[in-house]
Amino acid sequence: MSMKGKETMSDERIVVGKFGSTYGIRGWLKVFSYTDNAESLFDYSPWYVNQKGEWVEFKVESWKRHNKGMVAKLEGLDVREDAHLLTNLEIAIDPAVLPELSEDEFYWRELFGMQVVTTNGYDLGVVTDMLETGSNDVLVVKANLKDAFGQKERLIPFLEEQVIIKVDREAQRIEVDWDPGF
């Protein structure tokens, strides 16, 4: 394989998109973005692709809108056959390239693994996922095995001040105003 990507050592990456099929004969690929603003995917550089358990670094040489999607040309991929090897692989970035947020803003990944506790001190469980519903984001909380209400999972709306009382990054804890019976 004549890929000119650079192998990297760190394993911490954030998936921000996925490659689709090849486009043309000069190494272009369709790109699907998982970011809120699809084009912001191109603000983050370099990109990393996990190939056979190794993170390989790529730089975007060029990109453009195509129909209702986007296509990208990566440095070192000059023929369709090389680009085809990235089809359906995820695009990841180094967390360090993300903009810093204010004290009251959070990336979803920061909330994963945090303990969720009611204002009365009841331990609801641990955040395992987030859902985007359109009206508001929702915490997916895996309940403790000894949950008094028999819950295995809870969906808690991420409504600041109404439901989410406090997010403590240092203590890895989210305080919520939520009935444990739900």
UniProtKB/Swiss-Prot annotation:
Main location: cytoplasm
Pfam families xrefs: PRC (PF05239), RimM (PF01782)
Protein's UniProt name: Ribosome maturation factor RimM
Native organism: Vibrio vulnificus (strain YJ016)
BP GO terms, sorted: ribosomal small subunit biogenesis; rRNA processing
Family per similarity comment: Belongs to the RimM family.
Record keywords, A-Z: Chaperone, Cytoplasm, Ribosome biogenesis, rRNA processing
Family annotation (PANTHER family): RIBOSOME MATURATION FACTOR RIMM
Free-text function comment from the UniProt entry: An accessory protein needed during the final step in the assembly of 30S ribosomal subunit, possibly for assembly of the head region. Essential for efficient processing of 16S rRNA. May be needed both before and after RbfA during the maturation of 16S rRNA. It has affinity for free ribosomal 30S subunits but not for 70S ribosomes.
GO cellular component: cytoplasm; ribosome
Localization in the cell: Cytoplasm
Record-annotated PRC barrel domain positions: 103-182
Database matches in NCBIfam families: 16S_RimM (TIGR02273)
InterPro entries the UniProt entry points to: PRC-brl_dom (IPR027275), PRC_barrel-like_sf (IPR011033), RimM (IPR011961), RimM_N (IPR002676), RimM_N_sf (IPR036976), Transl_B-barrel_sf (IPR009000)
GO molecular function: ribosome binding
UniProt keyword annotation of rRNA processing present: yes
UniProt keyword Cytoplasm, yes or no: yes
Written domain comment of the UniProt record: The PRC barrel domain binds ribosomal protein uS19.
